[in-house]
Amino acid sequence: MVDREQLVQKARLAEQAERYDDMAAAMKSVTELNEALSNEERNLLSVAYKNVVGARRSSWRVISSIEQKTSADGNEKKIEMVRAYREKIEKELEAVCQDVLNLLDNYLIKNCNETQHESKVFYLKMKGDYYRYLAEVATGEKRATVIESSEKAYNEAHEISKEHMQPTHPIRLGLALNYSVFYYEIQNAPEQACHLAKTAFDDAIAELDTLNEDSYQDSTLIMQLLRDNLTLWTSDQQDDEGGEGNKD
């Protein structure tokens, strides 16, 4: 029998050593024991996979950029090598995302009861995130399918969070942040992105007195990120409009 506490201890140790693949493997084993995760365990799982997938997302962006430059040069051999390497990274990224999505569907979301709103929103947000990461590298019909799955998960989480969580709750705010990024970057829908981010920010500002002391730092940091994105996105839109003359 695997000792759950030992696995969690190993994940904590791996985090300190910045060995995120080990950390993810340990938390995957904890999840597969099929018992509800504590808040700390939930966060360990999230941090582990965020770093594992984050390394691949970053590599993919670098190689994609090199691929575009190489295509312009017209060196066939080099183009082929870069393309093959991008596809290798893509496969790794897809495997990590699939791993997380399987854990979410087979254990984590499945085991949330009707009153565990915070956990349900946390896991549905995670589901939206990992389908969004798949959408970043997917094309054609596959891209359309993962976008649909991402939006469905984000939307379900959003509805639950509005009904059952304070506007200042860091998980509700984090969801609004990522959902709005999904609209802006994946759906290419800046107006929806801005509306979602602005509503979340304004609702939180209106209820600042409900800010929990424990999560004060987390909540205010996410509010700052929402505001930063809004500033960036609205200036982008103004630039676009300015460049197009007086179009409605």
Swiss-Prot record:
<dbReference type="InterPro" id="IPR000308">
    <property type="entry name" value="14-3-3"/>
</dbReference>
<dbReference type="InterPro" id="IPR023409">
    <property type="entry name" value="14-3-3_CS"/>
</dbReference>
<feature type="site" description="Interaction with phosphoserine on interacting protein">
    <location>
        <position position="57"/>
    </location>
</feature>
<feature type="site" description="Interaction with phosphoserine on interacting protein">
    <location>
        <position position="132"/>
    </location>
</feature>
<protein>
    <recommendedName>
        <fullName>14-3-3 protein gamma-2</fullName>
    </recommendedName>
</protein>
<comment type="function">
    <text>Adapter protein implicated in the regulation of a large spectrum of both general and specialized signaling pathways. Binds to a large number of partners, usually by recognition of a phosphoserine or phosphothreonine motif. Binding generally results in the modulation of the activity of the binding partner.</text>
</comment>
<dbReference type="Pfam" id="PF00244">
    <property type="entry name" value="14-3-3"/>
</dbReference>
<dbReference type="InterPro" id="IPR036815">
    <property type="entry name" value="14-3-3_dom_sf"/>
</dbReference>
<dbReference type="InterPro" id="IPR023410">
    <property type="entry name" value="14-3-3_domain"/>
</dbReference>
<dbReference type="GO" id="GO:0005737">
    <property type="term" value="C:cytoplasm"/>
</dbReference>
<comment type="similarity">
    <text>Belongs to the 14-3-3 family.</text>
</comment>
<keyword id="KW-0963">Cytoplasm</keyword>
<comment type="subunit">
    <text>Homodimer, and heterodimer with other family members.</text>
</comment>
